[in-house]
Each structure stands twice: as structure tokens, then as C-alpha cells.
Design a protein with these regions (language model features):
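Alpha-helical transmembrane segments of integral membrane proteins
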Residues: 1-22, 280-284, 313-350, 361-483, ...
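Mid-to-C-terminal secondary-structure elements
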Residues: 123-136, 149-286, 488-671
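Generic structural signal for small/hydrophobic residues in well-ordered secondary structure
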Residues: 11, 21, 42, 58, ...
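Interfacial "coupling" helices/loops that link adjacent transmembrane helices in transporter permeases
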Residues: 14, 305-346, 693-731, 788, ...
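Hydrophobic alpha-helical transmembrane segments of multi-pass inner-membrane transport and secretion
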Residues: 13-39, 286-322, 350, 430-455, ...
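Membrane-helix entry/capping segments
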Residues: 1-4, 9, 13, 49, ...
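Small-residue-rich transmembrane alpha-helices
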Residues: 30, 34-37, 265, 346-412, ...
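Membrane-proximal extracellular/periplasmic loop immediately following the first transmembrane helix
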Residues: 36-101, 216, 220-228, 241-243, ...
Length: 801
């Protein structure tokens, strides 16, 4: 208790040092805590599943001359074949229905129409045997019958209201499938890649295969249809993977194709959320590289806060040297002094932890928004309290051990004469080293910020090869009734003054569509690479501003099926002149031959992480699920309202949904933009904490050099020369830190940029800019204390012992 009172008095007596110490630690602890919570949340995905470590997804890889493609899906008939091949395992399938509309019949005919962007699946009972769901009503066997649907509790309440039993009630899916509610499952946690809201029996889609890309053929592999396996405890996945190679050879060898080697393998459930090679049914994925980056930033920020504390504490120890000497003369031994100083450190850390909790609580909404985190963050949960206690103990030890050992080891005679500064208090070289480490970390973060922001700017301003501005994308149904209305709908859209062009299509030029197939060119055998597909009407080029390199667009008057290839396709076929491809023919899979009427200039069909793939654009009305509208930039809101009015007139049974193309493209880089923003925030925090560390070292130097400054002033030294004396040393330290930060930052940012096929080039400007920023901020930090020392009364300085 005595040590606690003494610690509190010292804390209150040295308000300036205490404020800086507590502030730096609080910011460091809060930042580290929030980052660790985010990382832990991402790592927790689907860990609530009972058989988490024994569940696998059966995925597909296909090797071609131009590389390997990965697909989260597997052919539909593989399910029964796998059950025969591996009777010891449990298999189940899940088929996604993205962006479907659920219609809930209401009294009076005013039906409720709800668009579910994610969460609608077709599932078989086997899936619910693998993944554990809490059934509030019904059982997995309910999904063995066609027309059966299971709802989550939250979804049932949204559709039918609270307190109403939904079992036995009717729904309609996309105005095509009549369904009866046969079961209710409890709500799943948000940290899952299987956000089941509506589960329709797989038997239902089997009877309506054309509606949801359900192709019961060994030649069709789609990430929409996925198969999962539950292996018995003790069963090694490696042995199963070896058998899957033989399984693939048996079932794929008869398929006519162009692959060099197609196979299946098991992907563990713990890897699914992080493996960016494959699609998931969740609304976002996080690569492990991102998690490692966030973890390192958290550790670095916390480490810098500890370094800052050490610097300030040792700087303060000079002013407390006489106190330590008196305590030793009065009988205190080194052990007692050590624990007193550690106690003071613990008190500071405790206050900092309380302040950190306040900062973290205020920052939670902002952090959740940045990282798109849906789960509620309970800062006072048992796990977080334990995490905070662990951080507090670690910080107390790391930040307190050196000052405690140093100050408790003062020679009492030297301390009473106030000559400790001559002994350098444990060596100023250590504190210089700590400042170098601080600024090396902060400069790494500054470089990372500059590079990430520059890459994001490059992406925003990159020439995509098509027009993405003021392009509105509508969703439309492809049922027979809606398809019959397409012509009249398009005609009315063109009458709207704000609409320049329209196109019915499967998807816009840039999308997450990965449709591809084997093909043959000019009556040759199948090529050894795949062609990617887009289906669109004749308005596609004008609506999206695509340019022809040769030939002409296909027209409705063409007597044979026709399409366009891109320049990447041209070059992979061994041609350089676009005109050479015009008039040639191309066959998709085992279908009919298509006339190539033109070559379109390359455009970026996906994220800039990927190179331009060989492309074939061809009309095919049954898959026109989107309508692209090029709008005049003036009066966009008015035009959108008129478009919605026309849509509702033609499709009253469907809810109107639309989005702008540029917003959809931005979603490709959502995680990268989040990372760039986090870099900005934590680079700023790192610089701030580093400047506090500088302030500590300058404070130490100002005390140590008090008499030297006085002598220099008496001998005629100017204020600027004294400021230069202080700044020179720190300039050298920062330059040294730059040469540590430079290679590390270059390595990490090169690795990050290598994920982008189209990227900026690292130049000296990024690194020199970071150095100049660090120097500028450091000089400002040093200047305050240096000027104060330079303008002090030299007479008082010369009296200093």
C-alpha cells in the first residue's frame, strides 16, 4: 500500500511525463486490442461447428498450358459417385441461388417481395448431417422431398412475423417454385461462410434444372454447386486425396476437353475462409496475409508504446536520482526499490488500460465499419478481459523491467551528488537503439501507406477498356414470362430521355463471373486452354464503350450464330493481326460452330489482380439476367426513378433491384481499400508514438546537457546552433532507421503488389517520401524541447550539478 501511495504521488508530481506515458500506452494498448479482436474474429469462422476439423470441401483443379484454374465446385453427379467410392465418409451437397426473390403471400394480394442477396441454398439432408444446425422444428429428412423449404428463425420472423408458426406456410422462389415450410433452424452466428437463411430441398432444383444452373453432367463444374465430406475421426485426408486422383481419372477421362489434368482434392474447413483461390458462399473472405499484416501492426504498435514508456521513464530517472540515493541511504535495498518502480509502472499501466478501454469502446463502431465486421464486439467479455490482462502484464514487464533495474541500481553516493547522468543511466546507446527501432517501424508503415494508397489510386484511374461511369445495372428474371417481355421492356427503356444505350446480358464487362469452357478454333482439335464467356445482345459494345480492333459487331440479321473474340484470345491462338481472325469459326465445348465477326480490344473483365483472359462474347438470350443502361450524367436520380417505373410496369411480380457498375467494381478492391485505410490510421499512430519517444530522449538529453548548453550560450552560441546540436543526432538516428525500414518495406510491399497483375512500380520516391515525412515530424518534435533548452537562463544552467 505504501508503494502504491508513493507511486500515485510520483505520478501526480510529474504530470507531464505521466500524461505522455499514459497516453502513449493507452493508444498502443487500444490499437493492439482492437486489431487482435478483429484477427480473432476472422480466425473464428465456422469454428462453432462440432466436427470443424473433420469437415472438408471437395474442390477441383484443372491444369492447362496457360496455368491452373481452381473451382470450389464439382460436377453434380460426383455426389453419388463419391458415396460409392468412399462409403466410410458422409457426403452432402449445397447449391447456391444468388440474389433470388422470395415472395410471401399476404392477405389482400399485396404479397411481400424480398430479395435475398446471400443465404438461399438448395441442400440435401447429407449437408445437415455434416454441419450441425439446431433444429427448432422439423429435421434434415424434411429436405428429402421436393418443394420443401427450411427457414432460419430470423428469416421466418421476417417473412411471417414474430409469434407466428411458419411450418406449413407457403412461399414462392423467383415466382417459379412453390415451396412449403417444413422446418425451422436456429440462427447461425455471423462468423460463418454458410449463412443459411432459406434452404430448399435439392430434389426441387433437380426437377427445375434450367432455373439455377443445375447441370447434371460430368462436363460441367460450377462453384455454385459444392460438395462437402465428413471424414471419420482418425481418417487422414492425404489418403483420400490419393484416391481422388484415381477417381478423377476414372470419371473425367471420357470427357472431351482441352485440359492437361483435371482432379479433385479435399480442402479443410479451417482453410475455406482464407483460401482466395476458391469462392465461398459467405459475403467476404480474408486472406491469411492480411491477418498476419494486422497482427504484426498490432504487435508493432504495442512494442512502440513500450519503447516510448522506457525512453520517458529513463529520461525521468535523471530527475529522480537523488530520491533513489536518499532511499538507499535510509535503508532501502535494490530489491525493494525495484518492486517500488515496478509498482509505479503497474499503476501507470493500470490507468493506461482503463483509458485504453475508453478509447477502444469509442472506436468500435469505426473499426467495425472499416473491416465490415458484423459481430457485436463485447469489450468486457471474459476473453477480452483476459486478453487485456495479458497485454497489461506484458506491457508492465516489458516497459518496467529496464527502468526498474536501471534506477534501483544507482550508486547512492553518485545519485546524491546528482552525477548519475555522467554514468549514462544504463547506456544512452540503448535508448538511441530504441528510437531507431521505433522509427524503423513507423517508416515501414508510412511506406506501406504511401504504396497502398498509390495502388488504390492507380486502380481507380486505370483504363479498364470500357466505360464504367453512369452505367446502371438492373437484375431481371429469366423465366419464360419475363423473357417474352424483354423486347417491349427494352423498347420502353430507350424512350426514357436520360437513357443513351441499353444491353441485355449475362453480366457486365467486369464481374465475378468465371464462365469458361473448352473450345476448338477453325476446325482444329480442341485448344489446350479455356475461353471465358460473356453472353450479350448487339447493344453490348455501345452500352459499355467497348472498341473493335477489326471486323464488325454481330447483328440480329446474321444467318449463322456469331460472336466476338478479344485480343488476348487472338494472341493465344498465335495471331497478331486482328483481321486474320475475322471470318474464322469457333466451337464451344461440343456445340455448333460460331462465326467470328470481329475482334474487340482487350478490357479488364475482373479485378486488376488478374491478367486479361481469352474471351468470347456471343448472344444467348436464356442467360440474360442483367440489363445495362448507359445514362446521361445529368439528372441521374430522375432517370433512375423513370427506369424503376418502367420496370415495375413490365415486371410487377418482381422487386426492382439495381446498382451502378462502378460501385460493383469497387467491391473487387474492398479489402485492399480497407487495408490501405488501416495503414493510414496505424501509420499515423506509429508516428505519434515515435514522436513521444523522441520527446523522451530529447528530455533526457536536455537534462544531461544542461550545463553544456549553458556554457555554449555564455560562449556566444545562438539558439539555432543549439537546436542543431540536438537535431543532428536525431537526424542521424532516423536515417539509420530508414536503412533498416527500406529493405523490409520493399520486400513486403513487393509481395503485396505481386498479387496485382496490373500495378504500380516501386520507385525511390515512395521511400524518400517516407524518410522526408519522418524527418519533418521528428524535427518538429525535437524543436519544442530543444528551443526550450536553448532559451533557458545560462546562469541557472551553470549552477546545475
Amino acid at each position: 500500500m505504501t508503494n502504491l501511495k508513493t507511486g500515485w504521488r510520483n505520478l501526480w508530481r510529474n504530470k507531464s511525463f505521466s500524461f505522455i506515458n499514459i497516453t502513449g500506452l493507452a493508444i498502443g494498448i487500444a490499437a493492439a486490442m482492437l486489431l487482435f479482436i478483429v484477427v480473432r474474429y476472422e480466425l473464428s469462422y465456422d469454428t462453432f461447428q462440432k466436427n470443424y476439423n473433420n469437415i472438408y470441401r471437395v474442390v477441383t483443379s484443372d491444369r492447362f498450358e496457360d496455368g491452373v484454374t481452381y473451382n470450389a465446385g464439382i460436377p453434380v453427379p460426383a455426389l453419388e459417385a463419391l458415396r460409392v467410392k468412399f462409403p466410410q465418409a458422409t457426403f452432402g451437397s449445397l447449391h447456391g441461388a444468388y440474389g433470388s426473390q422470395v415472395t410471401v403471400p399476404m392477405p389482400g394480394g399485396n404479397d411481400k417481395k424480398i430479395i435475398e442477396k446471400v443465404g438461399i441454398f438448395f441442400a440435401d439432408p447429407g449437408f445437415f448431417s455434416i454441419f450441425n444446425f439446431h433444429w427448432l422444428s422439423g429435421s434434415p429428412e424434411a429436405l428429402a422431398q421436393p418443394g420443401a423449404v427450411v427457414l432460419s428463425k430470423e428469416t421466418a420472423e421476417k417473412y411471417f412475423g414474430k409469434g407466428v408458426s411458419p411450418v406449413g406456410k407457403l412461399l414462392k422462389l423467383d415466382n417459379q417454385l412453390s415451396l412449403k415450410v417444413s422446418g425451422i433452424i436456429d440462427n447461425l452466428p455471423v462468423n460463418t461462410d454458410y449463412p443459411v437463411k432459406v434452404a430448399v430441398s435439392m430434389e426441387t432444383v433437380k426437377r427445375n434444372p434450367d432455373l439455377y444452373n443445375y447441370n447434371d453432367d460430368w462436363g460441367n463444374t460450377s462453384s455454385t454447386h459444392q460438395i462437402y465430406a465428413l471424414l471419420p475421426a482418425g481418417q487422414l485426408p492425404g489418403a483420400v486425396n490419393k484416391q481422388l486422383i484415381a477417381f478423377a481419372e476414372e470419371h473425367y477421362k471420357k470427357r472431351k476437353g482441352n485440359g492437361l489434368g483435371k482432379t479433385n482434392f479435399l480442402q479443410p474447413l479451417p482453410d475455406i475462409h482464407f483460401d482466395t483461390r476458391f469462392e465461398t458462399f459467405g459475403d467476404h473472405r480474408t486472406g491469411k496475409t492480411t491477418l498476419w499484416t494486422l497482427s504484426l501492426i498490432g504487435v508493432f504498435i504495442l512494442l512502440m508504446a513500450c519503447i516510448n514508456f522506457i525512453n520517458l521513464s529513463t529520461a525521468q530517472s535523471i530527475t529522480r536520482s537523488k530520491e533513489m540515493g536518499i532511499r538507499k541511504v535510509l535503508g532501502s535495498n535494490r530489491r525493494k526499490l525495484f518492486w517500488q518502480i515496478m509498482g509505479e509502472t503497474g499503476l501507470l499501466v493500470a490507468v493506461a488500460v482503463i483509458l485504453a478501454l475508453i478509447i477502444a469502446r469509442l472506436s468500435v463502431p469505426f473499426v467495425k465499419h472499416i473491416v465490415s465486421m458484423q459481430e457485436e464486439i463485447h469489450l468486457f467479455s471474459v476473453t477480452n478481459i483476459l486478453l487485456l490482462a495479458l497485454i497489461g502484464l506484458a506491457v508492465t514487464f516489458l516497459a518496467g523491467i529496464y527502468p526498474s533495474l536501471s534506477m534501483s541500481g544507482f550508486n547512492p553516493i553518485t545519485a546524491l551528488k546528482n552525477k548519475v547522468m555522467s554514468a549514462k543511466v544504463g547506456g544512452i546507446s540503448l535508448r538511441r537503439g530504441l528510437v531507431v527501432l521505433q522509427f524503423a517501424i513507423s517508416q515501414m508503415l508510412i511506406i506501406g501507406t504511401i504504396v497502398a494508397v498509390s495502388q488504390m489510386d492507380f486502380i481507380r484511374n486505370a483504363d479498364l477498356g470500357f466505360n464504367k461511369d453512369a452505367v446502371l445495372m438492373l437484375n431481371i428474371s429469366i423465366d419464360s414470362s419475363s423473357m417474352s417481355k424483354q423486347y417491349a421492356f427494352g423498347k420502353d427503356l430507350k424512350k426514357i430521355p436520360g437513357v443513351e444505350n441499353i444491353s441485355f446480358t449475362s453480366d457486365p464487362p467486369a464481374s465475378d463471373n468465371n464462365w469458361s469452357t473448352n473450345f476448338a478454333f477453325d476446325h482444329r482439335p480442341d485448344e489446350k486452354f479455356q475461353v471465358h464467356l460473356k453472353f450479350a445482345d448487339t447493344g453490348y459494345l455501345n452500352t459499355f464503350g467497348l472498341q473493335l480492333a477489326a471486323g464488325r459487331n454481330y447483328e440480329p440479321s446474321d444467318t449463322t450464330r456469331a460472336g466476338l473474340i478479344n485480343e488476348a484470345m487472338l494472341h493465344m491462338l498465335g495471331m497478331q493481326d486482328p483481321a486474320d481472325a475475322v471470318g474464322k469459326t469457333l466451337r464451344l465445348g461440343g456445340g455448333n460452330w460460331n462465326l467470328i465477326t470481329g475482334v474487340v480490344k482487350d478490357f479488364k473483365a475482373s479485378s486488376l489482380r488478374s491478367e486479361v483472359k481469352p474471351m468470347f462474347i456471343v448472344p444467348y438470350k436464356p442467360v440474360y439476367e442483367r440489363v445495362g443502361l448507359k445514362l446521361h450524367s445529368a439528372n441521374l436520380a430522375k432517370t433512375q426513378a423513370e427506369v424503376e417505373k418502367v420496370y415495375n410496369a413490365h415486371f410487377p411480380e418482381y422487386a426492382y433491384t439495381a446498382s451502378f457498375l462502378d460501385e460493383s467494381i469497387n467491391e473487387f478492391y474492398k479489402q485492399d481499400s480497407q487495408l490501405a485505410l488501416l495503414y493510414k490510421i496505424f501509420a499515423g499512430l506509429a508516428v505519434f508514438i515515435a514522436c513521444l519517444g523522441l520527446y523522451g530522449l530529447v528530455s533526457f538529453m536536455a537534462v544531461q546537457k544542461t550545463k553544456e548548453v549553458g556554457i555554449r550560450k555564455v560562449l556566444g552560441a545562438s539558439v539555432s546552433s543549439i537546436v542543431y546540436m540536438f537535431s543532428k543526432e536525431f537526424t542521424v538516428l532516423i536515417v539509420i532507421s530508414f536503412f533498416i525500414a527500406f529493405p523490409a518495406a520493399w520486400y513486403f510491399m513487393t509481395a503485396w503488389l505481386n498479387d496485382f497483375h496490373y500495378r504500380i512500380q516501386l520507385s525511390a520516391g515512395f521511400f524518400i517520401g517516407a524518410l522526408l515525412i519522418s524527418l519533418g515530424i521528428a524535427w518538429l518534435s525535437v524543436a519544442y524541447k530543444a528551443i526550450a533548452a536553448a532559451v533557458s537562463n545560462p546562469v541557472k544552467a551553470l549552477r546545475t550539478e
